[in-house]
């Protein structure tokens, strides 16, 4: 398989600086070597730059860096569309705003192929705010609402060529949801498996249910993995830590199941903030998880000291 890694040094979607260093942190953690050691071809496409900014102002004055955020979304969407034509694109973040570009880009490509696009959202948060409902103004909390075609983005974010059907989005590991997001998600068919459901039923049963549906509908699956999906005890390098996240074992099980399914066609690695890391610990964990998704099994995975 030909893996293509593209750095998306976005930090305008979050209230803390540092995510722009994420792509190079993954490189320093050996992401390309990890891919090649599994027998895959790896091409590093470097880091993307945002499109030209244009003046934009929204009535919600809490919103931060709207022109710059939109410039990033435009550039990322085109890049994701281009790189999803062939091979396996891996998008290195950068904060989760980048998914407002990656998902629309790959969904546009899927629509041209006549295939349904599915998204597995591995995150502590639903990221289902609109420009009108966000109170923090941090636009990394808006991608899912945007790419599923919710109202409130018209005239600001780019028009979607192929909105994702909300029922084709599965959120796994959710444990922090704002009231406005909760009400908005309840009005859709987005599949939400929060940590209580994981505790009650186990992550394998819940994930298997979603993967069976993706397979039955001959879908393409994009995985968007946020550092804060993981418990901060194993992945501290994120500005939005929420206790009670996925364990190292749960996360690897998910990645191995995804590999076994053969359904995953693209991947986001997001919200890594090296400024908050401990000697590269989180970057190493994320690279290790990616390797499991690409085929590294327990029997041949080298032991790494984090």
Curated annotation (Swiss-Prot):
Record-linked CDD domains: Arginase (cd09989)
Recorded metabolic or biological pathway in which this protein acts: Nitrogen metabolism; urea cycle; L-ornithine and urea from L-arginine: step 1/1
Gene Ontology CC entries for this record: cytoplasm
Details of cofactor binding: Binds 2 manganese ions per subunit.
Coiled-coil regions listed in the entry: none
Superkingdom as given in the UniProt entry: Bacteria
Keywords of this entry: Arginine metabolism, Hydrolase, Manganese, Metal-binding
GO BP, sorted A to Z: arginine catabolic process to ornithine; urea cycle
Leading EC class: hydrolase
Listed cofactors: Mn(2+)
Documented EC number(s): 3.5.3.1
Binding sites annotated in the UniProt record for substrate: 125-129, 136-138, 178, 240, 271
Classification via InterPro entries: Arginase, Ureohydrolase, Ureohydrolase_dom_sf, Ureohydrolase_Mn_BS
Record's catalysed reaction(s): L-arginine + H2O = urea + L-ornithine
Binding locations of Mn(2+) 1: 96, 123, 127, 226
Chain positions recorded as Mn(2+) 2 binding sites: 123, 125, 226, 228
Molecular-function GO term, any one: arginase activity
UniProt similarity note: Belongs to the arginase family.
Protein name, UniProt field: Arginase
Gene it is expressed from: arcB
């Amino acid at each position: 398989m030909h893996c293509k890694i593209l750095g998306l040094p976005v930090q305008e979607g979050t209230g803390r600086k540092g995510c722009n260093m994420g792509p190079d942190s993954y490189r320093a953690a050996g992401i390309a070597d990890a891919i090649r050691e599994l027998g895959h071809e790896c091409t590093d496409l470097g880091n993307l730059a945002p499109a030209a900014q244009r003046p934009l102002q929204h009535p919600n004055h809490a919103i931060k860096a709207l022109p710059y955020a939109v410039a990033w979304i435009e550039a990322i969407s085109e890049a994701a569309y281009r790189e999803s034509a062939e091979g396996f694109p891996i998008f290195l973040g950068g904060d989760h705003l980048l998914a407002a570009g990656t998902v629309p880009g790959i969904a546009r490509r899927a629509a041209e192929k006549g295939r349904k696009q599915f998204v597995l959202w591995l995150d502590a948060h639903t990221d289902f705010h609109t420009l009108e409902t966000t109170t923090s103004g941090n636009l990394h909390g808006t991608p899912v609402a945007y790419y599923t075609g919710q109202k409130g983005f018209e005239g600001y974010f780019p028009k979607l060529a192929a909105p994702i059907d909300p029922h084709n989005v599965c959120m796994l590991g959710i444990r922090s949801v704002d009231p406005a997001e909760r009400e908005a998600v309840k009005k859709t068919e987005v599949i939400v498996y929060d940590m209580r459901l994981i505790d009650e039923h186990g992550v394998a049963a819940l994930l298997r249910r979603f993967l069976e549906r993706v397979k039955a509908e001959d879908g393409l699956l994009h995985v968007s993995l946020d550092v804060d999906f993981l418990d901060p005890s194993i992945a501290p390098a994120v500005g939005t830590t929420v206790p009670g996240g996925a364990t190292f074992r749960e996360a690897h099980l998910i990645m191995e199941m995804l590999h076994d399914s053969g359904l995953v066609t693209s991947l986001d690695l997001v919200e890594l903030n090296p400024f908050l890391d401990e000697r590269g610990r989180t970057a190493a964990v994320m690279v290790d998880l990616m390797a499991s998704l690409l085929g590294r099994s327990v029997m041949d995975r080298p032991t790494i000291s984090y």
